[in-house]
Amino acid sequence: MADRLHAALAVLPERLGWHVALSASALALGLAIALPLGVAAARSPRLKWIALGGAGLVQTIPSLALLALFYPVLLLLSGVAVKVFGHGFPALGFLPSLLALTLYSMLPILRNAAAGVSGVDPAVVEAARGVGMTDRQRLWRVELPLAAPVIMAGVRTAAVWTIGAATLSTPVGQTSLGDYIFSGLQTEDWVAVLVGCAASAGLALVVDGLLGLIEGGVARREPKRLWAGGAGLVIGLLAALAPWPARRYRKGGPPMSSGPRTSPSSTSWPN
């Protein structure tokens, strides 16, 4: 058992780095899309109905099915890109995982952004309008600051969802902490399964706690909590990714192995 634990921990920095990179990228992309869409939805009931309905529909699709769904889509688009531009892009690995997790992260951010902006006291908005603020000034100086605690709660939920769902990216060729779980189940290596579950749960708890500090700092107007949470996230991100650039891509390899895998239509990864 000690040998298995040592072997599992030896590849933890690589798998944790990939897991953090994937989760952070998906969350950042989801935030960049869902936040402006949520603000716009708060001003348009029709757009709000369409946006929340679409994001809710995505949530009804099981995470693993959503990840797998992008493989044939990207395979088709890659074939078209080869004919048009002369080169394609990976249909397995980081790209489909990123797209699926981005969609999966959008609902809580979108819902809370729309609810937060809509919930701002109309009297406050009218007072801002009365002192001559433009629509943009009201948004940035009044509405978004007041809605920030609600929005941060959505980001916090989305982060935990994304970290958990990222463990399911292993079957589509992306290295993550899920490699421990899937390979351990295949080989009945319960030490690997335990390490994967503990690492992913621990990561989710740490991120949730740090985002909770930021949420509390925003809600209570306490800069110390805000900076403590932000600094913790930055330090944690850098610590997780520090050994990651030194790792080289591994081409091919057996299913559920460490390192990104490629599809026949994808471009070649560096050796």
What do these predicted ranges mean?
Residues 11-22, 72-108:
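Loop-to-helix entry region at the N-terminal start of transmembrane alpha-helices
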Residues 24, 136-168, 191, 195, ...:
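Transmembrane alpha-helices
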Residues 1-6, 10, 209-248:
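Transmembrane alpha-helical segments of polytopic membrane transport and secretion proteins
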Residues 1-26, 140:
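Periplasmic/extracellular loop-to-transmembrane helix junction in inner-membrane transport proteins
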Residues 177-213:
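Hydrophobic alpha-helical transmembrane segments of polytopic membrane proteins
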Residues 252-264:
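Short, well-ordered beta-strand elements
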Residues 109-155:
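Short cytoplasmic-facing helical segments at TM-TM junctions of multi-pass membrane proteins
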Residues 37-72, 101, 111-118, 225-230, ...:
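Cytoplasmic-entry segments and transmembrane alpha-helices of multi-pass inner-membrane transporters
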